[in-house]
């Protein structure tokens, strides 16, 4: 069970809504993933009507919607988008994204922290997408963010946990949930994130662009479950030396 702010989730896999070939395929993949929290970019939906091609099937699926501010380049733009989302969707939950460079889509740490502090004061439940910076993540936690979402690698790159060393520090010091977001390309990456202590992962591109998104979503669901179970089971510690799993000489001594 994962708790963030006032909500609890059975699934530790969060999913996105971009890059799917159709809305129907998107919903089928989300259902197959078991995800209960789904992000959607405000710039991709028509907030004036609930029969929007993306919004309507998500509402029907009964998932918790996490609107994001993707496309915002400044704190002011993100705050404006957040208020539009709250008014249109009736939720104060928000994935805060501010990335001024469209080529790399890396989060702006200064603008993100500034927007996060303001939005928390305005009553939003803020989950900020941020760099894998332990100092920044701690500052975001201190201003009241409900979770932190450090990147594993650039958005959509499928490179995996390239920031692993920093993620480990973030996880170790965090007192709010840590959701590894961006760069997760295959199910084994998700399993590794849960094994190392992350509370959840957010996956979009790896599922949406797969040859079979529904089966890939199932694979991610199983990987997240396996990673979490492995961590909870207490894996053995690493060693530089070999340790025999059975006696090496007992049968020789017995027959001497």
Swiss-Prot record:
InterPro entries referenced in this protein's UniProt entry, alphabetically: Aldolase_TIM (IPR013785), Thiazole_synthase_ThiG (IPR033983), ThiG (IPR008867)
Enzyme class: transferase
Residues forming the catalytic site: 95 (schiff-base intermediate with dxp)
Keywords: Cytoplasm, Schiff base, Thiamine biosynthesis, Transferase
Function: Catalyzes the rearrangement of 1-deoxy-D-xylulose 5-phosphate (DXP) to produce the thiazole phosphate moiety of thiamine. Sulfur is provided by the thiocarboxylate moiety of the carrier protein ThiS. In vitro, sulfur can be provided by H(2)S.
Complex and partners: Homotetramer. Forms heterodimers with either ThiH or ThiS.
Protein name in the entry: Thiazole synthase
Organism in which the protein naturally occurs: Escherichia coli O139:H28 (strain E24377A / ETEC)
Gene: thiG
């Amino acid at each position: 069970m994962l708790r963030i702010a006032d909500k609890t989730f059975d699934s530790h896999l969060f999913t996105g809504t971009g890059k799917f070939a159709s809305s129907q395929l998107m919903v089928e993949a989300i259902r197959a993933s078991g995800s209960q929290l789904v992000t959607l970019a405000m710039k991709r939906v028509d907030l004036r009507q609930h029969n929007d091609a993306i919004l309507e099937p998500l509402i029907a699926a009964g998932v918790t919607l996490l609107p994001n501010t993707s496309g915002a380049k400044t704190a002011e733009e993100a705050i404006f988008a957040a208020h539009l989302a709250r008014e249109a969707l009736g939720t104060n939950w928000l994935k805060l994204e501010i990335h001024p460079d469209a080529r790399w889509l890396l989060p702006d740490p200064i603008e993100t922290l500034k927007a996060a502090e303001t939005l928390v004061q305005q009553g939003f439940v803020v989950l900020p997408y941020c760099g894998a910076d332990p100092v920044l993540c701690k500052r975001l936690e201190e201003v009241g963010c409900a979770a932190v979402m450090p990147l594993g690698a650039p958005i959509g790159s499928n490179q995996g946990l390239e920031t692993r060393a920093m993620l480990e520090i973030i996880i170790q010091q965090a007192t709010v949930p840590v959701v590894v977001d961006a760069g997760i390309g295959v199910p084994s990456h998700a399993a590794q994130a849960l094994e190392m202590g992350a509370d959840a992962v957010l996956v979009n591109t790896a599922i949406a662009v797969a040859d079979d998104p529904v089966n890939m979503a199932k694979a991610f669901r199983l990987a997240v479950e396996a990673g979490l179970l492995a961590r909870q089971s207490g894996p053995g510690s690493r060693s530089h030396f070999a340790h025999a799993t059975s006696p090496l000489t007992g049968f020789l001594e017995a027959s001497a």
